[in-house]
Amino acid sequence: MSETTSWQPSASVANLLKRASIVAAVRRFFTDRGVLEVETPAMSQATVTDVFLYPFQTRFVGPGAADGMTLYLMTSPEYHMKRLLAAGSGPIFQLCRSFRNEESGRHHNPEFTMLEWYRPHYDMYRLMNEVDDLLQQVLDCESAEMLSYQQAFLRHLEIDPLSVDKAQLREAAEKLGLGDIACREDDRDSLVQMLFTFGVEPNIGRDKPAFVYHFPATQASLAEISSEDHRVAERFEVYFKGIELANGFRELTDADEQRQRFEQDNRKRAARGLSQQPIDENLLAALKNGLPECSGVALGVDRLIMLALKAEKLSDVIAFSVERA
C-alpha cells in the first residue's frame, strides 16, 4: 500500500459519535409519534425519469437472470415506500442509503443517507409543520419562515415566476451575471429554476430555516396540483444556511396522471440527448390499486448533521466520503 493512501476516515471519531446520537434522536422522534420504520430495496428494475437526476446502473448476471438484468441503485426510496402505503402500512419512515451519479463536493456525495417519511391524511402544511418540529429539535433553531415560491421571487427578484415571459426571465438573468447561459436556454422552466438557484436560494434561510412552497405546476414532479390555484403544485422545499435540506409533496395519487408525467419527463430527456428511463410499472399499479391521500418528504441526513455540528463540508460528518471509499 502506498504511504500516501488515505486510509483514515474523512470524519473525526468525535463527529461520528455525535452523528450516531443525532440519528438515534431522529429515530426516537418518529417512534415516539407512532411512525413505523421500514426497509426497502437499494436496487430496482426501474428508476426515476427526472431530467436532472442521474442514477447509477448495474447488471445482475446471477442465477435467474441468464440474459442479465439491468438494475438501478435507488436515488430515493420513494417508489417502494408508496407501494407499502398502498398495501396499508400506515405512516412510515426510513433512514437509508441513496445514490446519485452526480457531483461530489462540499454539499454532495454520490452515496448519502436519506430520511424519508409519509403521513397518510396529512396535507402539505401539516407535514411542513412536522418537518419544522424535527429541525428545531435537531438543530436547536428558531421556527422556520414559510413563504410561497411566488413570494420568494417577488421579494428577491421583483418578478412573478407564474406569469413572467422568457424575455423577462433572460433580463433578470442578465442582472445576475447569467446572461450568457440564459441566452442559450430555451426552456422556460429551466430559466425559472436557474433564477431560483442563483437569485433566491442564496437570500433565504440565513438565520432560520425557510420553507418555500407552491412550486410552479410545471415542476410538480410527483406532487398534486393545488385545487385552489392550478398554476402551482403542492410541493415544498426547505433551505437553511445556503443548503437545500428537504423536498416534500402532497402526493399525487392518480396513476394515469403520473404515467403522463413520467412520459413527459422521458420526452424532455430525449430532447436533451439523454437516455429515456424505464417507467416503474409497479408504482403505477400501486397508485391504481389505491394510494391513500398523504404527504411525504425526503430530507438529506448528512446535510442535517453537517448543520447540527457546524461542519464545513459533508466529508466532515461522513465516515468515508467518495474520495476515501
UniProtKB/Swiss-Prot annotation:
Residues in coiled coil: none
PROSITE patterns linked: AA_TRNA_LIGASE_II (PS50862)
Biological processes, Gene Ontology terms: lysyl-tRNA aminoacylation
Molecular functions per Gene Ontology: acid-ammonia (or amide) ligase activity; ATP binding; lysine-tRNA ligase activity; tRNA binding
Catalysis performed (reactions): D-beta-lysine + L-lysyl-[protein] + ATP = N(6)-((3R)-3,6-diaminohexanoyl)-L-lysyl-[protein] + AMP + diphosphate + H(+)
One GO term describing the cellular component: cytosol
Enzyme category, top tier: ligase
InterPro entries hit by this protein: Aa-tRNA-synt_II, aa-tRNA-synth_II, aa-tRNA-synth_II/BPL/LPL, EpmA, Lys-tRNA-synth_II_C
EC number per UniProt: 6.3.2.-
Ligand binding (substrate): 76-78, 118, 251
UniProt keyword annotations, A-Z: ATP-binding, Ligase, Nucleotide-binding
Residues holding ATP: 100-102, 109, 244-245, 300
Family: Belongs to the class-II aminoacyl-tRNA synthetase family. EpmA subfamily.
Subunit structure: Homodimer.
Function: With EpmB is involved in the beta-lysylation step of the post-translational modification of translation elongation factor P (EF-P). Catalyzes the ATP-dependent activation of (R)-beta-lysine produced by EpmB, forming a lysyl-adenylate, from which the beta-lysyl moiety is then transferred to the epsilon-amino group of a conserved specific lysine residue in EF-P.
Descriptive protein name: Elongation factor P--(R)-beta-lysine ligase
Lineage: Bacteria, Pseudomonadati, Pseudomonadota, Gammaproteobacteria, Enterobacterales
Gene: epmA
